[in-house]
Every structure is written in structure tokens, then in C-alpha cells.
Regions:
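DNA major-groove recognition helix of helix-turn-helix/homeodomain DNA-binding modules
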Residues: 46-61
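Short, charged recognition helix plus adjacent turn
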Residues: 9, 29, 34, 41, ...
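A short, Lys/Arg-rich alpha-helix, primarily the initiator
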Residues: 1-16
């Protein structure tokens, strides 16, 4: 079981940089990098909400479950 984080896909679709996203969401570039590489062990709902608002997407566009 694994959760795949597709933030890079959404960044490309929105033509946005990681730095721009981190600033809009209110997290550090380092924390965004940890999330993007799948090394994060958890994500707060408030952070997920901010990501979805900044990227104009749904949680399922960012997170994917693979068995």
C-alpha cells in the first residue's frame, strides 16, 4: 500500500513553481519538497485545504492510493 503525491503534476498543469505554491500555502519550500517526494508521514487537513485552494483542485488530484 502506498500513497502517491501528485503535486508536481498539478504544478505543471497550473504553470506554477514550487516556490510560488509554498508561498501561497504558507509552508516552507523544504516542507513542500518533503511532501512532493513522498517522504512526509502525514499532512494536516488545513495544509491539504490550502494546497487544493492554491492549485484549484480536489484532494484526489493531489493524493492517489496504489495497492
Amino acid at each position: 500500500m502506498s500513497i502517491i503525491v501528485n503535486v508536481d503534476v498539478m504544478l505543471a498543469k497550473r504553470k506554477m513553481t514550487s516556490g510560488e505554491l509554498a508561498e501561497k500555502v504558507g509552508i516552507t519550500a523544504a516542507n513542500l519538497s518533503i511532501l512532493k517526494t513522498g517522504k512526509a508521514r502525514a499532512i494536516r487537513f488545513t495544509t491539504l485545504d490550502a494546497l487544493c485552494k492554491a492549485l484549484d483542485c480536489q484532494p484526489g488530484d493531489i493524493l492517489e492510493y496504489r495497492d
